[in-house]
Every structure is written in C-alpha cells, then in structure tokens.
Regions:
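Non-catalytic surface loops within mature trypsin-like serine protease
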Residues: 27, 125, 234, 262-264, ...
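C-terminal coupling/interaction segments
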Residues: 252-320
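ABC transporter nucleotide-binding domain
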Residues: 171-259
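A generic structural signal for secondary-structure junctions
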Residues: 77, 103, 224, 286-287
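Alpha-helix N-cap/helix-start and coil->helix boundary motif
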Residues: 8, 92, 192, 217, ...
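ABC transporter nucleotide-binding domains
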Residues: 2-4, 9-206
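A structural signal for well-ordered alpha-helical scaffolds and beta->alpha junctions
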Residues: 111, 233, 275-279
Length: 320
C-alpha cells in the first residue's frame, strides 16, 4: 500500500504546486488525471524521490520512503515524462548501462537480462538499433523496460502516452495492464482514455489539489439522467456555453454535436438524454458548482457528493 498524507510543495516565488494531497493506493493501476499544470509531475517526482516536498509524508507498506530514498530506489521503477536516453547507444546497450548503473546485474547476466526486458516490451527486433532511430512509442517502451528492471513493487509512469499515435498507445496499454497485475502502478495523465482503459480507480487533480477519487464506472453513474446531447449551430454555441455546462462539442457537417450537463435532469429544447461518458464526468469534476463547500471554505464539485465518489478538496492558486 502506498500512502500519501498532506503532501505540500512550494517552489520559490512562492508558487504552491501541491496543497495537502492525500491518497491511499493499493495493488493494481491507479490513475492521476488532470490538465497540464495541475501538479501531476511534481507529485510523481516527489514519490520517485527526485524532488523533496515542503511537508507531508509518503509510506510504502508502512516504510517512510522520503526518509530513506535509497531504500525507495530498490523497490521503485520510474518512467518520467522526459526520460534521458543516450541517443547514440543501441536499445540493448542503453539497458545494459542502466542495469549496471542501478546495480541490478553485471557481466553476462546484464546482457541476458537486457535482452529479456526488450523481449518483454516487444523491442527485441530493434535491440541493435540506435535509440535516436526509435519512434516515440518505441522510446516509451524502452523506458518501461528500464522501469521494470529488478522487478519493483511500485512503478511510477508520468504522462506515458502523450504524443503517441493510437496504435502505439494501445500497444502501451497492454504492457501497462500486464505490469499492474501484481504490483502498484501509478499513472499520471491528462488523457481521459488512459484512465478509462487502464485504471480501476483514479483521482482528479486540479490546481495542486485532489478534487475527487473514484472509479470510471462510479464517475459515469453520478451523472445518470443529467447528460443531454443535441445539434447546435456554430453561431449559437457561445451563447449556449455561457448559459449551460457544455461538456463536449464536436463539429459534424457544419453543426456542433454538443453534450451538456443539466443538474435539473430536464432536457433543454432540442436536446435528448445521452449516456454519460468519462469525459463528461471529468469535465464536471473539474468544474464543481461554487455553492458547494467542504466546510472549510473551499469549493468541491457537488455532483461528486454521491456514493463511490469521494470529494477531497478543490480550488486554490497553483500553476504546476
């Protein structure tokens, strides 16, 4: 169990990047979903031991990992958003170097383990190819190969599918799903599909604060009967957005197919009831009604006050 309590990070400025984040994460895949600048990478870097928090605690199976970063690295696999590979090395040589650097293997065992890891992420065919010749998806898979070296109990992956084409993304999904079968995998992303496909549970982070923790199914169920869809002329879209909560708008043959969230559960003229999607739920969780408070003056999404959707905190001035 990974337990995070009241994690705060303040950068010089001062800029508060995290404001009291608390989460309990068990075995399997857990998603941290939020927009760019929400604090995801700061959170992940602290958990990975490469950034010190201002305050708060992080324990893994009861062990204080912030107090002993070296112990953390023995059980951690980390794939940051921008992983620094040596472009002139082959994939095989890159993994061999990392395995020896981390003290996982030496000599012939290093070559054998590197080859096994490349096979695991479907890169054996490119073992001798230079990393600079790898596609974005291949580089991500190489990153996962180094992250799982040593069979870590905790794997942290930060924005792993950003920039990948659909084929590479789904190939990466399969690899991550296999990894989560017997260990804790924490995934940060701004892509709703990542969470929908991979994560039994996830948290939504906004402005350095977790606004809700839930599952994809629970998040969709909280909107039952309150999502409606209709066609709107482009010239009328701005007025609709000013009057209603527009969760999605897609231009189709000159008209906008628009989805709205209507808390009254009454369909506006020209709209029909629609099945809620996780994209709808994410929008609602990110834009809570300002008249709902958590008792401390902060607003929370009132729509999240249903069984299975735990409002944590929201609102605050943060940029990371």
């Amino acid at each position: 169990m990974l337990s995070v309590r009241n994690l705060v990070k303040v950068y010089p400025g001062p800029v508060t990047a995290l404001q009291g984040v608390s989460l309990d994460i068990g075995t399997g895949m857990f998603g941290l979903l939020g927009p760019n600048g929400a604090g995801k990478s700061t959170f992940m870097r602290i958990l990975a031991g490469v950034l010190e928090p201002t305050s708060g605690s992080v324990t893994l199976d009861g062990r204080d990992v912030l107090a002993d970063p070296n112990a953390l690295w023995s059980v951690l696999g980390y794939l940051p958003q921008d992983f620094g590979f040596f472009p002139h090395l082959s994939g095989q040589a890159m993994l061999e170097y990392l395995l020896e650097l981390k003290g996982i293997a030496t000599g012939k065992e290093t070559r054998k383990l590197a080859a096994s890891l490349l096979e695991r992420v479907n890169l054996a065919y490119a073992a001798k190819r230079k990393v600079k010749e790898y596609s974005g998806g291949m580089r991500q898979r190489l990153g996962i190969a180094q992250a799982v070296a040593g069979d870590p109990r905790l794997i942290i992956v930060d924005e792993p599918t950003a920039g990948l084409d659909p084929e590479e993304r789904h190939r990466f999904y399969r690899i991550l799903a296999e990894l989560a079968e017997r260990r804790t995998v924490l995934l940060s992303t701004h892509i709703v599909e990542d969470v929908a496909v991979l994560c039994p549970r996830f948290a939504v982070i906004r402005n350095g604060q977790v606004v809700a923790e839930t599952s994809p199914g629970e998040a969709r169920r909280m909107l039952a009967g309150s999502i409606f869809e209709g066609a709107v002329a482009t010239g009328d879209l701005a007025a609709l957005q000013a009057a209603k909560r527009v969760t999605q708008a897609v231009l189709v043959e000159g008209r906008n197919r628009v989805r709205i969230h209507e808390p009254s559960r009454e369909a506006p003229p020209g709209f029909e009831a629609a099945i809620p999607t996780l994209e709808d739920a994410y929008f609602v969780l990110m834009h809570g009604r300002p008249n709902a408070t958590n008792g401390a003056g902060s607003t929370v999404p009132s729509d999240a006050r249903v069984p299975g959707v735990t409002p944590i905190v929201s609102d605050g001035e943060v940029v990371r």
